[in-house]
Structures are given as structure tokens and as C-alpha cells.
Swiss-Prot record:
Segments traversing the membrane: 104-122
A GO MF term: methyltransferase activity
Gene name of this polypeptide: yjhP
Record organism: Escherichia coli (strain K12)
Taxonomic superkingdom: Bacteria
Transmembrane among keywords: yes
Keywords tagged on the record: Membrane, Transmembrane, Transmembrane helix
Protein name per its UniProtKB record: Uncharacterized protein YjhP
Length: 248
């Protein structure tokens, strides 16, 4: 059980597996006004940066679930590095369908709503682990600029323009699902650059170290196209944000 190898390779040096920066996560943690002891469930927790830094800065406790064995190991090391391994725990498992044994104050799926078929499915899943009145965090892409054609959308790495909504459309969809949007923090292009461009050096170094690997041709093909594809299409078209929701 693991994520596709191209992601394990290209994001192996990432601490954050989405377009947020450390500063954006710090802002999000601050605006949520969490008290020490706040219990958080994070589905698709990646390398654990959100839970680990919030445990350090806000005294939260939490559990992260991720199907990447590499990222889960990195999350555990990060918790030890920050001295919070008694507060946050990371489990290598498929987050799809995961429900916490004990209800949480905050239930999050930040950039991994695909585990439940999209943000609506993620909301249904997270709601099962959330205390009444608790905060749900959904991290989701949106169109900053709607692609003019389906071909441009596909060049952005999605199958169709219908895969994502605009920002007003996304906020409206949360409203339609019966949630108040009580906070949001949006990524900026600097965060997108750090997320995407960091992959390129990682892939290049991996190719240098593994020239005879059976997967090298696929990594080389991705590195050949990724920079131009990103700056031509995705950088201008994509937005991304984390939205804090409370059920009405």
C-alpha cells in the first residue's frame, strides 16, 4: 500500500506536500484560535508538518493518517525533531474511510480530498470523526482563471475544467452542503513555486543517483515537461486554499 512512485520520488524532499508555506500554516494555526489540548485528525497527513508545528506552537494533540510509507516515516522523524512525539502520532494506512475512535475538535483533509472522491465526500467522511460544533478543514484547489479550453485544463494536469470550481463556486458549494465558512487561508504563487519547482531538483538528483532504475525513463519524461507545463498553464490557472467549516 503506497502512493504512486512518481510522487514518492518527486516530493521526497518536501516537508509540505501542497502549495502552502510554513508561514501559511502558521497563519492558519493562529486564526483557528486553538486551545492547548485541541484534538485533531488529519487525513492525508503527508510528512506531518501541520500537526507537528501546531503541536509545538499551540499545544494540540493529533493523529495523522497517510498511505505513503516514506512520508509517514518523515512525519515521525519531524515529530521527534520538534519534541512533540508524545502529542502527535502518525499511522501508515489508507485514509479513505478512516474514522477516529474518539471524536475530534478539528478534522482535516488538506489537499487529499481525492481519498473520498472530492471535497463533498471528504466532508461526509470527516463529519464522522468530528465533535458537534467542531471545525472541519478542507484543503482544495480551485480555478483562479478558468481555462479557455478543455485542452488547457488537461495541460494543467486535470481531465476537465469541471474537476474544480472557481473560488466563489467552491465557497458556494460549502454553503450548499450546510456549512458556514468561518475562516480561509489561500496559497499564493510563491507557495505554488515552492511546491512545484522543488520537485524538479529532487527528480534531477534522483536521476543522477539512479540512472539504471526501471523507473528512470518515467522520471526523465516528467522532468522534461514539468517546468514548462507549470509556468505555461498551472501557475496562472490554479489557486489553492484551506477552508475552515462549521456545520449549521
Amino acid at each position: 500500500m503506497d502512493i504512486p512512485r512518481i510522487f514518492t520520488i518527486s516530493e521526497s524532499e518536501h516537508r509540505i506536500h501542497n502549495p502552502f508555506t510554513e508561514e501559511k500554516y502558521a497563519t492558519l494555526g493562529r486564526v483557528l484560535r486553538m486551545k492547548p489540548g485541541t484534538r485533531i485528525l488529519d487525513l492525508g497527513s503527508g510528512s506531518g508538518e501541520m500537526l507537528c508545528t501546531w503541536a509545538r506552537d499551540h499545544g494540540i494533540t493529533g493523529t495523522g493518517i497517510d498511505m505513503s510509507s516514506l512520508f509517514t516515516a518523515q512525519a515521525k522523524r519531524r515529530a521527534e525533531e520538534l519534541g512533540v512525539s508524545e502529542r502527535v502520532h502518525f499511522i501508515h494506512n489508507d485514509a479513505a474511510g478512516y474514522v477516529a475512535n474518539e471524536k475530534c475538535d478539528v478534522a482535516a483533509c488538506v489537499g487529499a480530498t481525492w481519498i473520498a472522491g472530492g471535497f463533498a465526500g471528504a466532508e461526509e467522511l470527516l463529519a464522522q470523526s468530528l465533535k458537534p460544533g467542531g471545525i472541519m478543514l478542507i484543503g482544495e484547489p480551485y480555478w483562479r482563471q478558468l481555462p479557455a479550453t478543455e485542452e488547457i485544463a488537461q495541460a494543467c494536469g486535470v481531465s476537465s475544467t469541471s474537476d474544480f470550481l472557481t473560488l466563489p463556486g467552491l465557497v458556494g458549494a460549502f454553503d450548499d452542503l450546510g456549512y458556514d465558512v468561518v475562516e480561509m487561508v489561500l496559497a499564493d504563487q510563491e507557495g505554488w513555486d515552492r511546491y512545484e519547482a522543488a520537485k524538479w531538483l529532487t527528480m534531477r538528483r534522483w536521476l543522477e543517483a539512479n540512472p539504471d532504475d526501471d523507473f528512470a525513463a518515467e522520471v526523465r519524461a516528467e522532468l522534461n515537461i514539468a517546468p514548462k507545463r507549470y509556468v505555461t498553464y498551472a501557475r496562472e490557472c490554479f489557486g489553492w486554499g484551506v477552508f475552515a467549516l462549521i456545520a449549521r
